[in-house]
Amino acid sequence: MPTINQLIRKKRQSSASRKKSPALQKCPQRRGVCLQVKTKTPKKPNSALRKVAWVRLSNGQEVIAYIGGEGHNLQEHSIVLVQGGRVKDLPGVRYHIVRGALDCAAVKNRKQSRSRYGAKRPK
């Protein structure tokens, strides 16, 4: 417990809240280049091979981003758009790649939740 004199000399510091997506630096999305595209296995009760990409953003930071949807066309040197949003069962994956933007193709034959996957309205 500090004394009153100590509090006068140095005020109490309010703890800054932790940012959920610090690499975006308050931007809604950022452009980046894929360094490698791999699969990761999820945390304990789940089992799958989730597709992720290591991306170097336009601000120079490197992040791991999740590639949503069934099938993708990404490879090394692909230009992608990255937005915030973690994947609950993949530790360290705090970003999503936007489907249907830049080099990342939209999901084919998608009928529902199309806007999330960049799919056009079927005729």
From Swiss-Prot:
Keyword list (alphabetical) reads:
Methylation, Ribonucleoprotein, Ribosomal protein, RNA-binding, rRNA-binding, tRNA-binding
Q: Which Pfam families match?
A: Ribosom_S12_S23 (PF00164)
State the Gene3D superfamilies in the record.
Answer: Nucleic acid-binding proteins (2.40.50.140)
Is Lyase found in the keyword set?
no
Q: Where is this region: Disordered?
A: 1-29
Q: Which GO terms describe its biological process?
A: translation
**Family affiliation:** Belongs to the universal ribosomal protein uS12 family.
Name of this chain's protein: Small ribosomal subunit protein uS12
Q: Which organism is it from?
A: Chlamydia felis (strain Fe/C-56) (Chlamydophila felis)
